[in-house]
Amino acid sequence: LRVIHTPGHSAGHIALFAERQGVLFAGDTCANMFGLGPSIMYEDAAEGMGSLARLATLDFEAVCFGHGRAITRDAAGRFRRRWAGGI
């Protein structure tokens, strides 16, 4: 299990990446409540967007969130399309 520092929601926020299983646990880095989007609350929005761009570089099959339904199909592709440019 790989621990990834993902500041933004909070300064000490982390995501967990189970590489062998292809699962990213994004926590509160982002949400999937009304479609894939950034977290509802960020202490630092710029840091949060940077964290999302970094997560978009990973290869995973599924992603789980602190809020909203998991994405189990094309999860990494959806992240890349949404945040690869840090947008």
Annotate the PLM regions.
Residues 84-87:
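Acidic/His-rich, metal-assisted hydrolase cores and their charged scaffolds
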